[in-house]
Amino acid sequence: MNRRRAYEDDGDFYGERNKKRRRVSENQEMEERLETLILRVGENSTSSLESNLEGLVSVLESDLGNFRSKILRILSDCPIKMPEKCTIYSTMVGLMNAKNYNFGGEFVEYMVKTFKDSLKQCQWDAARYALRFLADLVNCHVISTNSLLQLLDSMVDAANEDNVPQVRRDWYVFAVLSTLPWVGRELYEKKESALENLLVRIEVFLNKRTKKHHNALRVWSVDAPHPQEEYLDCLWAQIRKLRQDNWTEKHIPRPYLAFDSVLCEALQHNIPVIHPPPHQDSFEYPMPWVVYRMFDYTDCPPGPILPGAHSIERFLIEEHLHSIIEMHRWERKDCAIHLLMLPYKDKIPLEYCIVEVIFAELFHMPTPRYLEICYGSILIELCKQQPSKMPQVLAQATEILFMRIDSMNTSCFDRFVNWFSYHLSNFQFRWSWDDWDSCLLLENEHPRPKFIQEVLLKCLRFSYHDRFKEMMPEGYAKLIPKPPVPHYKYSMEGAASLPGTATAHKLVVAIRQKCNAEDVLNELNDLPNSRDASDTDMAEAPFNPLKIDVFVQTLLNLGSKSFSHSFAAISKFHAVFKALAETEEAQICILHNMFELWVDHQQMMVVIVDKLLKVQIVECSAVATWVFSKEMVGEFTKMYLWEILHLTIKKMNQHVTKLSREMNEAKEKLARTVESSSSESEDEAASPNAQKRRKNTEGSGEKPTEEQVERMEEKLEAAYVDQKRLFLIIFQRFIMILSEHLVKCDTDGRDYDTDWYRWTIGRLQQVFMMHHEQVQKYSSTLESLLFTSDLDPHILDVFHQFTALRA
């Protein structure tokens, strides 16, 4: 057989196939080119924006026949993913609508579908940006004012529904108000009475609205020098100011004004009637927030004036900066460059606006949007990008924060400490400490000296102790941390009189000679049990505190060289830990001995507790009980102790989430298995290869049985019980110590509002805020068991503020 001949005969076939490949490749290249052109319109260019828009519209119009769906999709995605370019894309759509009315109608339908889908999928930012874009299309004569007003009215109707969460109602009003800066002037000129009616309805809603959540979200407990306004109240004040100015603002670029003569001739489309999807229990809405203010015009140097707190320009600038952070947060250098290149940067004190917005994100309650280190790294990059201005503005901001720290929220205090210590570590720990020496006259529990002490403790994690002794002024000696060394009591003066010293020394020799877990237990067996002398609950808590004391202190001291040495020691003698820590009381004893050894090394305690939890030597409930134990009273206002408690809660939350995910995946696999089995049994007679196909598909993954799924459900249920118990322990201990303090102060006739009280009530609030998603599940249980009506109002109010967040 002539192989060459066969290939020659097939030449036409292969040639045709290659042509098809080339066509597909050409189409793909063209689509990518169109996408790039649309995405980059309005960016740096030698020609004007108007000429770029005209040229791009001509290109898109000529390609509509081949790439219609692609163009529709890109044009509807862009204003949502790049909201700062909203008016550029609305102008583009307006010009295309003027040339091709049918395309304009298709686009409006597509955009309305995008808006409705965003609402159904609880993509609230996307929905708000889609609404804004639809509103801006009114300015470009694509959509009629009547149909937009009808849509805005239906949004306000949704805000007035009964028996729905307030956070849902709030969002619908916020979406309408935040759209008005773009379209307010057009509505004012053409439908003034309808616009006024809309605003009256919103005002009535706002006047009836409760704001129990407000205090929980404040950065400071006082309003001087800047009021801390709830977000809807602030935006409403800004909209009212905009109305007073006849809806004229100076920030939004409006390229469509250059094409007014073309756009005004275009036919308009009507938005179909849109009914917002009804509330469902599975829907999660954005939580309320407080608008953060750090600067006003008096803080800025001569030059461009900072817009007032109630000017709409302040809202627009801040939203633009927040949007840049959201878009570029993964690349700190790009983020810093884009922040510094904000349009209209010459008309505002840009550095002050940027710093205020970044701290607003960092101090956002209940938790920041992104990791705290994200904001710290962006601020460092800003200082590098603009060394002549940014470091000075940041130093001024730090000074303002320090001077107002007395009334700062406890969670924000922690974040301020974390940020400042991280920032100092990147700038050789240089700071003008002498400017703050007035705080040395205050009590150690006062927030100012406490802040400096906590900052130095955090800085110690980035450096070494001797450096701080040399660096800090002499007056700060009492705030400098002690050297982070272990205190091994069996090698201290007077250790010979301790009952476990001889065994401890033997244990040191044995461990250094590479003994195993069984050898260690044999060494410990000779130690007497002080609990044998009494019959107190021996059946319930059969553990020997002296064994734990000798073993834990000796082992951790031998592993004290580094974190890795400590981890290796814990891993090697894991079996000994498990044998000694069979009860919660024994686990608390382990933690107490770790604390005795490492009392001056907070970071070591944090990582060791984390390790003990990870390898399941101690339970989460034991850590919580230890944190609130009498032995830890002296540590109660120190940050590291709450770092330990929060990592413990997070460990429990992650465990529950993991089990829940695994169970849901197993249920889905089981359901698919049952479904495929039934369909295969039906097809088996018709298809002789069905059994073979089934064997092939069965090998693709392990399928759970019903018994396995039931066991997983039981494990998840047990995890939920443990999680609920953990929160009950924590909140019960808070209530006990706070109630005791309040009663004692009342009895003694003293003011209850001490530094200790403010730290403790702040920590209670912090637990609610940091873990709000998990605590929310048990709010009814907490209300019925702990936060009852007879509780002191000061404590109860914290709980009510928390429940109001999602009310």
Swiss-Prot record:
Protein origin, superkingdom: Eukaryota
Basic and acidic residues compositional bias, start-end: 696-710
Keyword Signal included in the entry's annotation: no
InterPro entries in alphabetical order: ARM-type_fold, CBP80, MIF4G-like_typ-1, MIF4G-like_typ-2, MIF4G-like_typ-3
Region spans: Disordered: 669-710
GO molecular function per UniProt: mRNA binding; RNA cap binding
GO cellular component, one term: nucleus
Main location: nucleus
Pfam families hit by this protein: MIF4G, MIF4G_like, MIF4G_like_2
Residues of the MIF4G domain: 31-243
Alphabetical keyword list: mRNA capping, mRNA processing, mRNA splicing, Nucleus, RNA-mediated gene silencing
Gene3D superfamilies associated with the record: 1.25.40.180
Localization (cell): Nucleus
GO BP term (any one): mRNA export from nucleus
Role according to the record: Component of the cap-binding complex (CBC), which binds cotranscriptionally to the 5'-cap of pre-mRNAs and is involved in various processes such as pre-mRNA splicing and RNA-mediated gene silencing (RNAi). The CBC complex is involved in miRNA-mediated RNA interference and is required for primary microRNAs (miRNAs) processing. Also involved in innate immunity via the short interfering RNAs (siRNAs) processing machinery by restricting the viral RNA production.
Subunit (UniProt): Component of the nuclear cap-binding complex (CBC), a heterodimer composed of Cbp80 and Cbp20 that interacts with m7GpppG-capped RNA.
UniProt similarity note: Belongs to the NCBP1 family.
Official protein name in the record: Nuclear cap-binding protein subunit 1
Primary gene name: Cbp80
